[in-house]
């Protein structure tokens, strides 16, 4: 799902000011102590990294479209409960719902399904690696199509490195074709869908006054409707929960309730406490957890060029996002708490 993590605003976030040396100090999130955000940061990476394991387990008994439908329904119900507890509400403007229908298709329904199809053919850890290529799609679309970003030399170099990494992950020198290669293309296609959804959301949805929770809940509701319409024609009648093994039922519930619901709450807290810039770096940990979990839980193995390519991809993403040249702001001494940095959506 496309959720707030990097630089796109989906609601105003703030944090409490503290006292330093007898004066009121507005400690910026980027200066927050590690102990206040690191546990949630690692937990979020583990939750999103484990999603690829649960997809792999789920598609063993469910059609990818059915798995996605069940997952999205579980996630929507979870966020609706959180929405009710926090006394927030869904958007009411037809224009917002119209734009969210596009985000729901490209940020939820299609990519979730493509990852399911892909993991019928490739390892879960490899799907996790492909998920990290999303920023490589976001940048050219944001520059050329949606015109929400500007291409710089640094970004161009990062983009080139990233796509070099993609070729290494694919192992193009070994030949193109076969089910495994097609599965990788499906996973890359899923990441490409996120790449469409993120700049589209930034262009048409981010300026709305609704909270990130409200927009995400609406997004999942729309995606559930889209999938419910398509599923009978593509996958036939869905099996009853009693026809599924306990591990598949648990995987579906975990994907929806934990991977979407709880993960969203954790992510919003990470942004509030640590700042959007720090919270966005969870992108680099997700494939690491995906690989570790796939190796331990499913005894999966990678070819040598796949982790090497993944490192090149992550390096390219880091260069394009200016991670190596980023400077943290200093604490501001004064009265009142400034608004936290805005957040950009990321895919899981």
Model-derived segments and spans:
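Helix-helix packing/entry segments at the starts of transmembrane helices
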Residues: 69-70, 108, 127-133, 200-225, ...
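Hydrophobic transmembrane alpha-helices of multi-pass small-molecule transport proteins
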Residues: 20, 79, 101, 141, ...
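C-terminal transmembrane-helix exit sites in multi-pass transporters
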Residues: 78-90, 135-157, 288-308
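Loop-to-transmembrane-helix transition segments
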Residues: 36-45, 83-84, 89-116, 159, ...
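Specific transmembrane alpha-helical segments of multi-pass solute transporters/efflux pumps
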Residues: 47-55, 80-131, 141, 164-168, ...
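C-terminal-most transmembrane helix of multi-pass membrane proteins
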Residues: 2-30, 72-73, 248, 283-348
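Transmembrane alpha-helical segments that form core, pore/gating elements
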Residues: 79, 138-140, 159, 176-238, ...
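Glycine-/small-residue-enriched transmembrane alpha-helix faces in small-molecule transporters
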Residues: 1-69, 117, 176-203, 225-226, ...
């Amino acid at each position: 799902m496309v959720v707030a993590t990097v630089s796109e605003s989906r609601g105003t976030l703030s944090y409490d000011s503290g006292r330093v040396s007898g004066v009121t100090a507005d400690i910026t999130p980027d200066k927050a102590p590690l102990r206040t955000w690191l546990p949630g940061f690692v937990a979020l990476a583990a939750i999103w990294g484990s999603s690829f394991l649960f997809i792999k387990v789920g598609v063993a008994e469910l059609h990818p479209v059915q798995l996605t439908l069940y997952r999205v329904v579980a996630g929507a119900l979870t966020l609706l409960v959180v929405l009710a507890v926090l006394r927030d509400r869904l958007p009411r403007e037809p224009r917002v719902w119209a734009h969210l229908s596009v985000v729901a298709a490209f940020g939820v329904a299609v990519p979730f399904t493509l990852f399911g199809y892909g993991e019928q053919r490739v390892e879960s850890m490899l799907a996790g690696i492909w998920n990290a290529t999303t920023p490589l799609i976001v940048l050219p679309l944001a520059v050329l199509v949606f015109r929400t970003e500007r291409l710089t030399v640094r970004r161009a170099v990062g983009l080139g490195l990233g796509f070099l990494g993609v070729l290494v992950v694919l192992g193009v020198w070994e030949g193109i074709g076969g089910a495994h290669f097609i599965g990788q293309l499906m996973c890359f296609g899923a990441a490409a869908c996120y790449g469409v959804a993120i700049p589209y959301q930034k262009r048409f949805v981010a300026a709305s006054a609704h909270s990130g929770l409200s927009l995400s809940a609406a997004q999942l509701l729309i995606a559930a409707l889209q999938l419910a319409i398509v599923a009978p024609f593509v996958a036939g009648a869905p099996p009853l929960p009693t026809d599924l093994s306990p591990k598949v039922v648990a995987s579906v519930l975990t994907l929806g309730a934990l991977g979407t619901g709880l993960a969203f709450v954790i992510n919003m807290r990470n942004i509030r406490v640590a700042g959007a810039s720090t919270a966005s770096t969870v992108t680099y940990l997700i494939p690491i957890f995906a690989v570790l979990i796939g190796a331990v839980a499913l005894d999966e193995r990678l070819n040598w060029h796949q982790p090497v390519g993944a490192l090149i991809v992550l390096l390219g993403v880091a260069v394009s996002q200016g991670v190596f040249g980023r400077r943290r702001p200093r604490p501001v001494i004064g009265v009142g708490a400034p608004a936290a940095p805005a957040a950009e959506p990321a895919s899981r």
